[in-house]
Amino acid sequence: MIQIEQIRNYFPVQIRGNSGFDKHILKEYLQLMILDYLSSTPNIQKMAFIGGTNLRLVKGIDRFSEDLDFDCKNLSKDEFIEMTNGVIQFLERSGLRVEAKDKKNPKLTAFRRNIHFPELLFDLGLSGHKEERFLIKVESQYQGIAYPPVITNIKGYGFFFPFPVPSDGVLCSMKIAAMLARAKGRDFYDLMFL
């Protein structure tokens, strides 16, 4: 079982001493568990790790991110479901209660799975509400840009594993496209960071 006290020790005093960061710290730890698992699967050949969580875990941006986003050129919906089912089985074998709760969204062009962790926050003492929602979204979509991924080592919380990512130039162009398409503040922040 995950121990929040152990995870906190990987962070500077300013963060680990502030319980307001605990849910973010936990989410980031679970994201790293998932990425570490995926790095050892055959699907790794068809994906590149992108988005805000890439900036956090690979580049060191000083903001937490919610989702795991992948650029997957030749990954079918069935392969995506199989891949995320593997993630769920891995998390269950790691001692976590996990459920996939998928919502139909006709506007969504990406493949998405919402991986819920029922009662995890309550069990860890991070919430007084058993039913408080805690989830990680895994999304995959082909970005329409042909590029050779770069293998980088992702490290943190005691994890160390290789993962394909876009080059800095490609990642920057993806962030510019996101900024122009949706105009969210985090996209401007991310672009200034790059």
PLM regions: where:
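Helical scaffold of the NTase/Pol beta-like nucleotidyltransferase catalytic core
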Residues: 1-47
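Catalytic cores of NTP-dependent nucleotidyl/adenyl transfer enzymes across multiple folds
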Residues: 13, 32, 123-194
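Short amphipathic alpha-helical segments
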Residues: 26, 30, 76-83
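Conserved catalytic core of two-metal-ion nucleotidyltransferases
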Residues: 30, 88-134, 170-171
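Long, highly charged amphipathic alpha-helices
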Residues: 33, 82-89
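Short gly/ser-rich loop at a beta-strand->alpha-helix junction or flexible surface loop bordering the NTP-binding
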Residues: 46-54
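Catalytic metal-binding acidic patch
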Residues: 52, 59-80
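Short, solvent-exposed loop/turn segments at secondary-structure junctions
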Residues: 54-56, 105-106, 143-145
